Structures are given as structure tokens and as C-alpha cells.
């Protein structure tokens, strides 16, 4: 299965609590932090919810 590298490119300051929790659930803490996760529909849904805050690359 493919892997995705997700990078938090914008801050969560001033964002709704749901978006903050989603970013935290993806494993991102600080701006410019990155995680590599398995590509699946659940992760894709989380990325879609905060797509304006993150960048995604396929690995």
C-alpha cells in the first residue's frame, strides 16, 4: 500500500477545535512537522478536512 508524507504548513492558531483535533490525530504537532502514514480512506478524509493547513506527498 502507498504511503503519504503529510506536512503541517500552516498554524492551527485561530482554527476551529475540530480542525485542531484532526491535525493532532494525524500526528502533527508544530508547523513544518511531518509524518509518514499509510494511504487509506480514513486518512484521506482527515487530510481533506484540513487540506488548507497541510501539504501531501506520495512516497
Curated annotation (Swiss-Prot):
Belongs to the universal ribosomal protein uL30 family. Keywords: Ribonucleoprotein, Ribosomal protein. Signal peptide: none annotated. Gene3D superfamilies: Ribosomal protein L30, ferredoxin-like fold domain (3.30.1390.20). CDD domains: Ribosomal_L30. InterPro entries: Ribo_uL30_ferredoxin-like_sf (IPR036919), Ribosomal_uL30_bac-type (IPR005996), Ribosomal_uL30_ferredoxin-like (IPR016082). Transmembrane segments: none annotated. This is Large ribosomal subunit protein uL30. GO terms for biological process: translation. GO terms for cellular component: cytosolic large ribosomal subunit. Part of the 50S ribosomal subunit. PANTHER family: LARGE RIBOSOMAL SUBUNIT PROTEIN UL30M, MITOCHONDRIAL RIBOSOMAL PROTEIN L30. It comes from Staphylococcus aureus (strain NCTC 8325 / PS 47). GO terms for molecular function: structural constituent of ribosome. Coiled coil: none annotated.
Amino acid at each position: 500500500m502507498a504511503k503519504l508524507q503529510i506536512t503541517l504548513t500552516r498554524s492551527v492558531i485561530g482554527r476551529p477545535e475540530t480542525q485542531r483535533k484532526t491535525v493532532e490525530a494525524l500526528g502533527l504537532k508544530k508547523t513544518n512537522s511531518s509524518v509518514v502514514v499509510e494511504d487509506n480512506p480514513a486518512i484521506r478524509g482527515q487530510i481533506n478536512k484540513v487540506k488548507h493547513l497541510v501539504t501531501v506527498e506520495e512516497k
